[in-house]
């Protein structure tokens, strides 16, 4: 028997990369592998996605892990550098960076570097998280264009705040803001991440930045990734470690929050919130077992969950239980738990075993 295991399908990762190329055929791809490649393993995912044109990460530590692991293609720091001391590290490792603040601009202007850096100026078109405000953008751009430490021309990027929602006015406004500033400027342009790739082809521009879609998961509540021709790259599974007779009126788990209305059989699966499965998953959350869906009952424990197998079940100790994967999309689990698919796949803990299928 195996305890909690995440099986990563390399074929699915490659398929998804090619599917994104089909969706954005005129754009180059920044494969976003931040946060341990959304829980899929940073180096393994990056090497599998070697046909990408560039890799996107959030932290310098992630970029340096890629370089140490043999990745030679361009790497983009999506959050930018944090301190002036980071700049020589970017130069030495040929790392590109977003620049979104006056502090970063001043650091670039003041630095003495052995070579200039490829820079992406981040424009705040409406996310209001990082980026240069539109009324300050032209002056900021001109200073970057005059900076000896910046490879010319300056590239321009932004990020949609609501591309994953049915409401379109906000995204239209952001795109119009981006175009008003970027039109006629010679650098590369990028604004579309996963949601923009799938729903906003007019926003694809020179570069797109696929994140969660690379892993076969939709950025939307619906439709699911499979509806866009994507394949789930992660299967999270574990094993039944107990099968028990359960009487009507008996509860199960901490707090006795679920009480059976009938005589039934309960199974116990070796996975819990200590593995990253959400403790808040309510009774009724589906699990895939022996070709059918069964339901979680009672509270998720640190190391175990209980499921209602049904009174006539023939399931046995050692049977494999699938928490999400091809048969049970992670988007479905997200809908049942109220926790985004982004969180589900990135929250797996270090004790979950990682297995890789394919070369």
Swiss-Prot record:
It comes from the Bacteria. GO terms for cellular component: cytosol. Its EC number is 5.1.1.1. Pathway: Amino-acid biosynthesis; D-alanine biosynthesis; D-alanine from L-alanine: step 1/1. Its cofactor is pyridoxal 5'-phosphate. The modification N6-(pyridoxal phosphate)lysine is found at residue 34. This is Alanine racemase. It comes from Yersinia pestis.
